[in-house]
Structure formats: structure tokens, C-alpha cells
Amino acid sequence: MFALVLHSHLPWLAHHGRWPVGEEWLYQSWSASYLPVFDALGRLADEGHTNLLTFGITPVLAAQLDDPHCLTGMHHWLGNWQLRAHEAALIDSAAGAAGTASSVAALRELGTREHRASDWALGQFESRWRHGASPVIRPLVESGVIELLGGPLAHPFQPLLDPRMRTFSLEEGLEDAHRRWNHRPRGLWAPECAFTPGMEGDYARSGIDHFMVDGPSLRGDTALGRPVRGTDVVAFGRDLTVSYKVWSPKSGYPGHGAYRDFHTYDHDTGLKPARVTGKTTPPPDKKPYDPALAAAAVDKHVADFIEVIRARLRSESARIGRDALVVAAFDTELYGHWWHEGPMWLEKLLRALPEAGIRVGTLADARAQGYVGEPIDLPESSWGSGKDWRVWAGDQVSDLVALNAEVVSEALAHIDAMPARLRRRDPVSDQLVREALLAIASDWAFMVSKDTAAGYARDRAHKHAHAMREIAAAAAAGDDRRAAALAAAWRNADGLFPDLDARRLRHTAATAAAPAAARAQEAAR
């Protein structure tokens, strides 16, 4: 069996900057990835296809795709895209030489093409997305087209999280999925595929019976799911041999010379006019993007990937002496945002796989149909560099590790000081917990470790920590009016998860051994 898994995640960006890092990131991913990917899945659903893939979407991304501010911002962004395309179509001078992507002729053709694309996207958004993503996703879940994977609120790095906050965040994340889609997931994509022994118990108690890890977590043996010893919770591993054929840190299909170049912009319009051309071709010399050439490359790479899957299934089945499972897993944002032709490739692949005689299913299908091997002791791991915790717990982010531990400790101290039996929700405590969760998102350490908008990431972590602390200080001082005003002000920017109720954290028991923050330094070594 072949199982394709897509994981969709962005940190909370609403109200926190626009460009180059901020809401622009959300709107680019929405237009380039989420619109076309769900359009393709909708077409396949209309044709009667089911059990196509396993789709993870984090609560923090789902919140933005349903948020009124983000919906309005996305509509404006799409209109601006159309205006930029119109501007490019009418350009009368350019710096590029004839035959290059930045020539007048190439930019005019680009403008015409982008105008059609933006018009399509506006139509899709206005007809299907104006009330958010939930009405788009829910029918696909209910009809069995996709299996939905859940995740904890706000995407924390769970192995380093206090067990009470970890349990609360996971349970609230699963309930958030249920409220949005009338479906409580039984599968999970843990943030960063991160694991530490004991988390399997958290999963079992929350009704999770399978989750994703990276292939090395299973010592590279991903041909079957493996129950984590002592539980019925099955870990499925990403097959790197297959997944890296599409995308890896060093290679993959998107680098083909015919595909649109992600990094080359026309700076006057912000549009991308060039094809990759060659790995060493400088931007001024890149050739204009040619959709026909790109489409031909897509067909070639669909056929190639099918043969990769077929060969892997045969070799793994022969090795283990029974039918094997191959799991390929990717960020959804690869398809469209990073790899312009990705949605086209994805739809053609999903059509071609059954025609090629390859059995396709979801992770839930794989578990139900017995693609499960012997129990395993799962080690501390992640899908980051080194497959350990160094990205989120290394020396480069030791200050953020310490900050996260302090934020959680201070938030729990506030919660524990709450009256034991509050009859009504406490908006002050709710917002304090909301800010604490945003402060400890794993995205900030990742961005710092990878030196990707590291300043923005540090600012965000400290901003949310400051918000939590000033609310807590006012509450501790008995200044209820100031605490309420601060909570309301921060809620204007960070009003996600409106059903979050701090009283539930007050009564959350610590059900697993605490992975103390001090272990982060040891894990990094």
C-alpha cells in the first residue's frame, strides 16, 4: 500500500506584520497551495474517489483560514495580485535582454498569464472560501476523501513541554478539530514529528491510535507501522528513499529547469517570471517561464515517481516477506507555494496511481488493514536536522528554551491560583493561556536555528511572553480592571481559539513524567 501524507502548518501571523514576514506568508501559501490543492481534491471527490491521502492541518493554521480578519486580508491580497498582473501586462520598458525572463515581451506574457491565474483564484475564494476553510474541508472528511490528522494548539515542541500544558494543548487541539469539522481525529501529526518516551501514553489517553514520525525514528524500517511498546498506538514512519525523490534538502523534482523559479522576482510587480533554467544560471540570464515545458516535466515526474513507488513496494515486500507499506510525507506548502507546479503534479499522481495498479490508502486504512509490525521502543527524535532535538533545544536557542520553561511555569502558577470552582469563564486567564501557547510555538526556535527571519521569530516569542506576564502581573496585584483591559487589548490581535477555557487547564492532571527543560541541553549534545 502507498500512503501519501500532507502536513499543513503556519504559525499565527494575523496582526503580526505584513511583509516580508507576517500575513504575506499566509496569503501566499493560501493562494498558491491551499486553493489549488483543495480544488484538485474537490474534483477528485466529485468523481467518486475516496481514501486519497492523509491530510494534517494544525489548529493554528485552521484558525487563520477561518478568521474574519484573515479572510478579508486574503480577499484584498488576491485583488492586489490581479492589479499587479494587470500592471505587468501593460509594461513598456524593462531591463532584461531579449529572450530572458525580464524582457518586455516576457513580462507582458507573464502579466496576461498571472491575470488569468488571479482571476481564477478570486473566483475560487469568493465562491468556496468566503466563510473560511471549514466548509471546504469538512465535506472531504465526511465523505472519506481524506483522513484528517490533528495536532496540539499553537504547535509547541512537545518533548520539552510541561506535561500538564502538553496534555491540555493536545486535548484542546483535538477538540478544536471536532468543533470545526465535526470530526475528532484519531491520527496525529505531532509538531516537528517530535517524540520523547511517555508521549505515547498521552496519545492513548486522548484517543489517538496512530501518528507520524520520521523514518530514522524507526531506524529506517518504515515498511510497516510499529506500535509503541506497551500501547496500541502505532507510529508510521516517513520513507525517506521515496519522499526525498520529490523533495529533500539538496534535490528533488522542483529543481528541474522547466519549473518556475521560486527565488527570481520581477521587483516592480512582485511576480515570478522565470523558469529555473539551470542550477547555476544567474537570475538575469534565466529564461521565461513556459507552461507547456513545465507541464511536460510534470508528466515525466509523475511517471518517474510511480516507478519509484512500485520499485520500493516490491523491494520492501521482498525484504519483510509480506506486503509492505510506503509512506511519503511532505509539507502541503511545497505544493504550489515552493513548487508552482506541485498541485498539478499531485492531482495527476492521484489519478495515475490506481491506473498503475498501486493500492492507495490513508494511515487509518493502513492500521485497519494490518500494515503493522512488531512493537518498538521509540527514541527521542524529530524530523529536523540530525533527526534529534538540536533545532529546538540546541545552544543557538537556549534562551528560547529557558523562556518557554519560564512562560509555562508562570502561566501554570497563575492558573493554580484561580478559584477551584469558577462558575463562569475568566477572559483574563483565557487570554493569558492563549499568549503563553503562542510564545512557546516551535516555529520561533526553528526560524532562529535556521536563520530564517530570526529577528522576527525572537520578537514574536518575547512579545507573547511579555503579554502573558503583564496580564499575570496585573491579576496577581489584584488590579482586575487593568488585567481585563490588557487581556481585551491583546485579544484584539491574538483572539484565536475562542473556545479556549483556562478552567480546563486548572483541572488538567499531569499524566506523564515531566520532560524537564534541563534535558534540552543534554538532548542537543
Identify what each model region corresponds to.
Residues 1-52, 57-112, 222-525:
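Active-site and substrate-binding clefts of carbohydrate-active enzymes
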Residues 42-49, 131-149, 178-181, 316-320:
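Acidic (Asp/Glu)-rich catalytic clusters
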Residues 150-172:
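Glycine-rich phosphate-binding "P-loop"
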Residues 166-190, 308-329:
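CE4/NodB-like, metal-dependent polysaccharide N-deacetylase domain
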Residues 184-195, 331-335, 453:
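Conserved short loop/turn motifs at secondary-structure junctions
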Residues 194, 199-208:
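Hydrophobic, small-residue-rich alpha-helical packing segments that form membrane-like cores
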